[in-house]
Amino acid sequence: MSDHDLALTLRQIVEFADEIAALVAKRARKDLDINREFRRASERCVELIGEAATRLPENWRASHSEIPWRQIITMRNVMIHGYDVVMADVLWDVAANDVPKLCGEIKLLLEK
């Protein structure tokens, strides 16, 4: 993967993370249970982050082990292949806590 493609993929992760941040900022945890559109949008952004992570070279991910790539990709796989088993509490925790942290870490990598 070229440096350009790597940077593009990282910027895509930031874009999806920013979308989740905008969604979560306007809502509360309970909204995942009552607002199907919000839940589906949140799920999709998490899936897209995981999909982008799979495109990053494995050796590059290994050299940036401060980011839990395996967990990110596993979450994507669970959402794609068994989305009905993802509990709203887990999705909220990922969207409200894990994704903003990931976004900050990716932005630092892009600055280097």
What are the roles of these predicted feature ranges?
Residues 1-112:
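Solvent-exposed interaction patches of small proteins and small membrane subunits
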